[in-house]
């Protein structure tokens, strides 16, 4: 299959596929005499793995390590646990910040009497 087909099957943009090739997340594909890239089912599976990992928020270096681990099914998954735990910790931190932000926004809205901007608690709070 060609890159457009891979893009359609995986839901990953063509430019992103090319980028993943450049950074080593996808192997360089074989090429036809015309120079067009040719992909197989393993490329579809690998790209699906990369996409899912990226959707879960893993950075490229973590995805690279996870791909490497995937190719060694007999190895311990300790490194995968470490990577996933670090990602979970980052998600928990973001959730905490978002929870605080939500509370701040609710408070600002509740404290604003809706009259004039000169007395607007929202504007005052943002201005510091």
Segments predicted by a language model, with ranges:
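Short glycine/proline-centered loop/turn elements that form peptide/ligand docking sites
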Residues: 3-6, 13-16, 33
């Amino acid at each position: 299959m060609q890159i457009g087909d891979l893009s359609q099957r995986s839901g990953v943009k063509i430019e992103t596929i090319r980028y993943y090739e450049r950074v080593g997340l996808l192997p360089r594909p074989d090429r036809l005499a015309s120079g067009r890239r040719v992909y197989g089912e393993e490329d579809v599976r690998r790209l699906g793995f990369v996409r899912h990992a990226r959707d879960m928020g893993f950075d490229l270096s973590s995805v690279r390590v996870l791909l490497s681990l995937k190719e060694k099914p007999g190895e311990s998954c300790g490194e995968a646990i470490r990577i996933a735990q670090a990602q979970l910790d980052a998600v928990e931190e973001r959730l905490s910040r978002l929870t605080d932000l939500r509370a701040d926004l609710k408070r600002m809205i509740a404290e604003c009497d809706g009259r004039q901007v000169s007395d607007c608690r929202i504007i005052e709070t943002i201005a510091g």
